C-alpha cells in the first residue's frame, strides 16, 4: 500500500513514522519520512524534504534504534531541507529554511537558514 501511495503522490512516508494532528504537506513530490521519525502537531513541510537517518558504521545495531529525527509542534520545514539522525530534535516553533542540512538539534523559537553555498573539493 505504501509503495502504491508513493508511486501516485511522490511522497514516501514509512508506516512506522509517528505523525501528530494537523500535519500539512504542500507540494509533496520528493518528501521522505523515515520509520522512526516523530512529528508533532501543526507541522508544515514542503517538497523535497527528507526526515531521514544518518549513515552508520558497518555492524551497528539498527533494529529498534531511533534513527530518524524528532520534530516538535508548530514547525515549518521549507523545500529541499534534510534533517537527519535519531538524536536530532527540532524543538517547537522552529522555521527551517530551504536547502538546509541539519544533523544537530535546534532549540525552540529558532529560524535556520543556509549560508551562501560554496563548493568544497576533496582531493583523492
Question: How would you label these PLM feature ranges?
Answer:
Residues 1-9, 124:
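Terminal amphipathic alpha-helical/low-complexity segments used for targeting or macromolecular assembly
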Residues 9, 14-15, 20-21, 26-35, ...:
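Left-handed beta-helix
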Residues 55-66:
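Extended hydrophobic/aromatic segments used for targeting, binding, or gating
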Amino acid at each position: 500500500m505504501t509503495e502504491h501511495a508513493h508511486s501516485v503522490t511522490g511522497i514516501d512516508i514509512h508506516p512506522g513514522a509517528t505523525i501528530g494532528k494537523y500535519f500539512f504537506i504542500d507540494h509533496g513530490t520528493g518528501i521522505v519520512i523515515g520509520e522512526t521519525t516523530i512529528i508533532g502537531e501543526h507541522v508544515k513541510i514542503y517538497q523535497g524534504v527528507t526526515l531521514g537517518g544518518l549513515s552508520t558504521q558497518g555492524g551497528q545495531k539498527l533494529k529498534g534504534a531511533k534513527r530518524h529525527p524528532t520534530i516538535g509542534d508548530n514547525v515549518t520545514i521549507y523545500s529541499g531541507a534534510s534533517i537527519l539522525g535519531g538524536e536530532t530534535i527540532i524543538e517547537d516553533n522552529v522555521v527551517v529554511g530551504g536547502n538546509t542540512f541539519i544533523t544537530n538539534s535546534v532549540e525552540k523559537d529558532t529560524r535556520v537558514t543556509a549560508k551562501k553555498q560554496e563548493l568544497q573539493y576533496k582531493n583523492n
